[in-house]
């Protein structure tokens, strides 16, 4: 009897364009402790929104990974995009490489996860383009080594996060419109987390308490906000400006972006039209799932 031949897996076309890397908002962010290795223990809820960088990938057969777009201040060798691609190569032993271009829209140092989201989109897109078929949990493990915010973008859903941000539970959040204000000030994450005045003992909450909250957008607080607004005056000014329209406005991540939820797009656009000209702002809509969630 002739043995049946096993066909090699069929690869997708060599080019994958217009891959979104969405921003995230931290609806609250509690610092609950600090590990011996220096990482902070957190509780937060991640909300994905439709403000995105866009990445483009072309498969190579020689194993070379290149970033074809220049990003001022970010050398290709240290870029999370390139590091993510190489981490995926190392984890799988694939012979493939990639040319990667990016339309960089999300501000760096904004607290909206731009670099982490770019890394996650790279992992998801190349998992597909290289025909690897890795499960989501494995991509999340690879992503965690790149940064604590990478796993939630690979996870692909809005999530209640614990640990250093990698212990994720999906949460249902209402369809929402937000105004995000970027006061054009770069806030270094390490500077905020290392500040001696940072509170690191916020009591633990449980997901059921958040789920039962009638207004999930006023739950808790951002423990990093007081530090960032004391150090960076434009962040403080932007937050106070936005609180004119929604008293529950708050900072996302370690800043510099601040945000508030509004009843509908019309109201959000009305607020955005009053934005002081020295700042950038966006009207964005919530996402229920990551646009590339099907790639894992």
From Swiss-Prot:
Give EC number(s), comma-separated.
2.7.1.148
Matching entries from InterPro entries are given as: GHMP_kinase_C_dom (IPR013750), GHMP_kinase_C_sf (IPR036554), GHMP_kinase_N_dom (IPR006204), IspE (IPR004424), Ribosomal_Su5_D2-typ_SF (IPR020568), Ribsml_uS5_D2-typ_fold_subgr (IPR014721)
The family database entries (Pfam families) matched by this protein are listed as: GHMP_kinases_C, GHMP_kinases_N
Annotated residues for binding of ATP = 107-117
Keywords attached to this entry: ATP-binding, Isoprene biosynthesis, Kinase, Nucleotide-binding, Transferase
The entry lists its GO molecular-function terms as: 4-(cytidine 5'-diphospho)-2-C-methyl-D-erythritol kinase activity; ATP binding
Identify which residues the record assigns to the active site.
24, 149
GO BP annotations of the record are: isopentenyl diphosphate biosynthetic process, methylerythritol 4-phosphate pathway; terpenoid biosynthetic process
Superkingdom to which the source organism belongs: Bacteria
Question: In which pathway is this protein known to take part?
Answer: Isoprenoid biosynthesis; isopentenyl diphosphate biosynthesis via DXP pathway; isopentenyl diphosphate from 1-deoxy-D-xylulose 5-phosphate: step 3/6
Reactions catalysed, semicolon-separated, are: 4-CDP-2-C-methyl-D-erythritol + ATP = 4-CDP-2-C-methyl-D-erythritol 2-phosphate + ADP + H(+)
In this entry, which stretches build a coiled coil? none
Family assignment?
Answer: Belongs to the GHMP kinase family. IspE subfamily.
Main function:
Catalyzes the phosphorylation of the position 2 hydroxy group of 4-diphosphocytidyl-2C-methyl-D-erythritol.
Instruction: Specify the protein name.
Output: 4-diphosphocytidyl-2-C-methyl-D-erythritol kinase
């Amino acid at each position: 009897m002739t043995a049946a031949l096993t066909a090699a897996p069929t690869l997708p076309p060599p080019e994958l364009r217009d891959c979104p890397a969405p921003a995230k908002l931290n609806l609250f962010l509690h610092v609950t402790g600090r590990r011996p290795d220096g990482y902070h223990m957190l509780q937060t809820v991640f909300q994905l929104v439709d403000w995105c960088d866009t990445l483009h990938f072309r498969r190579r057969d020689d194993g070379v990974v290149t970033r074809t777009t220049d990003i001022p201040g970010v050398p290709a060798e240290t870029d999370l995009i390139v590091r993510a691609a190489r981490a995926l190569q190392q984890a799988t032993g694939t012979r493939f490489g990639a040319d990667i271009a990016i339309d960089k829209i999300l501000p760096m140092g904004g607290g909206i996860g731009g670099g982490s989201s770019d890394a996650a989109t790279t992992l998801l897109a190349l998992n597909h383009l290289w025909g690897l078929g890795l499960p989501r949990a494995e991509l999340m493990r690879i992503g965690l080594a790149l940064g604590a915010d990478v796993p939630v973008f690979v996870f692909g859903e809005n999530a209640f996060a614990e640990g250093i941000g990698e212990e994720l539970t999906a949460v249902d959040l209402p369809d929402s419109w937000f105004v995000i204000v970027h006061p054009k000030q770069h806030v270094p994450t390490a500077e905020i987390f290392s500040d001696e005045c940072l509170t690191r003992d916020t009591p633990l909450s449980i997901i059921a308490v958040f789920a039962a909250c009638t207004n999930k957008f006023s739950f808790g607080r951002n423990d990093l906000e007081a530090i960032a607004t004391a150090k960076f005056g434009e962040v403080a000014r932007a937050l106070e400006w936005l609180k004119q329209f929604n008293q529950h406005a708050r900072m996302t991540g370690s800043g510099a972006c601040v945000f508030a939820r509004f009843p509908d797009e019309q109201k959000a656009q009305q607020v955005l039209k009053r934005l002081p000209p020295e700042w950038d702002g966006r009207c964005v809509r919530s996402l229920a799932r990551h646009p590339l969630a099907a790639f894992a």
